[in-house]
Amino acid sequence: MLSGFLDEKYGFLPVLIPITEPAVGYGAAVGLAFLSRPLGEARAGFGRPDITIAGGLGTENGSWGVLVGDVRHWFDDRLETQVGFTHMSANLDFHGIGQDARLDDHPLRYNLEPTGGVVRAKYRLGDSTFWAGLGYAFAVTRVTFDAPAGTPGLPDFTRDSKVGGLTPSFTYDTRDNLFTPLRGTFVEALVGVFDPALGSDDEFQRVQVIAIQYVPLLRTLYFGLRADGAATFGDAPFYLRPFITLRGAPIMRYQGDEVAQIEAELRWQFWNRFSAVGFAGFGAAWNDFERLHNTQTIVTGGFGVRYEIARKYGIHMGIDLAFAPDNTAVYIQVGSAWARP
């Protein structure tokens, strides 16, 4: 029934997602998602739906934000455009870049308030599942720390700063479904080049490579594996250094100049539209390759349940309970935990 409603001319999916992220506390995100199916049958890597979403969020520690985004396909699925805008105010704890014993038990409280947007276009190479892309990202960010100047562990930062840069990318995508894939591969290499000539206060570069594989093991048993790494070079602001994003790891808790992580997931569709999920991951963050002894590492794992709320679109929704050495977290999932447009 939900799939049929989404297929209507003005069909939309109301979104109400509880937030249980350890870094910001309990809260909720609300919004509307408009989906339109392409003409004809979708096949692996082709026939993606257009998606428009608008929403907002708030949490118990005073963090809040609003966002709008649109993913659209043109010229018989040869061109994909992505446009997004957000304004947020997030109250977070700074634990250092890499391992910093001074901040392990006494992190520094700060507020991060970015306002910005991104535009991106990806062009399909021939009739293949390879895409070449180019984007531009810009944001104005205000940073305030509760700690006074000279506090041990306080990072170098500018209260008000701008970042602007080009983000070329190369993507290979054969997933059979955008929301909850059963099979296929997603690999993307993304480079960010930020420079004063492009609107940035600082000159730095950021590189990220992510690979995701989905494999059906049996008719009702599906395996997924995600591995990715990221690195920054130059004078990147501390809040743009990469961080571990495993389920169970608080947002921006494990940061470094370089980050690598891997996560595996097994989903068993045991009855009708219901599934059980188990997952485990490992991540590492460090400052540079010459000081690997300062590496922060984390092992996570957990389990969850899913229900297929829109069969035509392959949208599964559910809840995950994740465990880490110093934390237990609950996540509400709409689609894959590793969703990529």
Residue ranges and their predicted role:
Residues 30-37, 68-70, 168-174, 209-213, ...:
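Short, well-ordered amphipathic alpha-helices
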